[in-house]
């Protein structure tokens, strides 16, 4: 099996949310409460609190839409920074993704976008088959659980981030 260590990226995005938010409240939209999603939420909260100890995360579930509580947190004036989808949206759709800030005019400004680089897994697995290091022994589980150091995931930060902030996040 293979999967990226999503908690590494969400921890750093939680830190960035704490640094860039003007309030102690930030939002988080999670897909559904399965697999690594609760761990990613926890990592985001821990990242937030590492730079803003009084910080609080308001959680909303994308799988349970509620018109009274929109996923862009437009009903909460105390939340200007929130984390939403972790996929790239089609060019020109202006949908929220990654870590965003809602500007006073309602436009969403991207701050940081996680990128899951699945091809890293595929290249290394195929390479190990070709160089003879891959072992297909029966009854033996092989797991690939790689993080940022492996290149399986990264964060694309928006231009204009403070140099001190970037030094902290790297």
Tell me what each language-model feature is.
Residues 1-2, 28, 102-107:
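Glycine/charged-rich beta-loop-alpha catalytic/anionic-binding loops adjacent to active sites
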Residues 2-24, 116-134:
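Hydrophobic alpha-helical segments within soluble ligand-binding/sensing domains
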Residues 9, 13, 37-40, 44, ...:
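Stable alpha-helical elements in mature extracytoplasmic
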Residues 10-55, 141-160:
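An alpha-beta-alpha
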Residues 32-36, 63-66, 87-91:
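Solvent-exposed loop/turn segments at secondary-structure junctions
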Residues 52-64:
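Short beta-strand elements in bilobed, periplasmic/extracellular small-molecule ligand-binding domains
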Residues 62-75:
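Structural motif
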Residues 77-170:
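A post-motif C-terminal structural segment
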């Amino acid at each position: 099996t293979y999967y990226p260590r999503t908690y590494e990226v969400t921890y750093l995005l939680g830190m960035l949310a704490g640094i860039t938010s003007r309030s102690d409240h930030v939002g988080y939209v999670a897909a559904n409460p399965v697999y690594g999603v609760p761990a990613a939420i926890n990592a985001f909260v821990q990242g937030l609190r590492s730079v803003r100890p009084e910080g609080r995360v308001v959680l909303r579930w994308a799988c349970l839409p509620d018109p009274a509580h929109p996923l862009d947190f437009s009903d909460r004036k105390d939340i200007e920074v929130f984390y939403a989808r972790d996929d790239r949206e089609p060019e020109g759709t202006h949908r929220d993704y990654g870590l965003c800030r809602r500007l006073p005019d309602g436009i969403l400004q991207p701050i940081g976008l996680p990128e899951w680089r699945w091809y890293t897994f595929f290249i290394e697995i195929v390479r190990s088959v070709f160089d003879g290091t891959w072992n297909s022994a029966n009854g033996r589980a092989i797991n690939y659980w790689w993080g940022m150091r492996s290149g399986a995931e990264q964060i694309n930060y928006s231009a204009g981030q403070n140099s001190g902030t970037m030094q902290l996040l790297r």
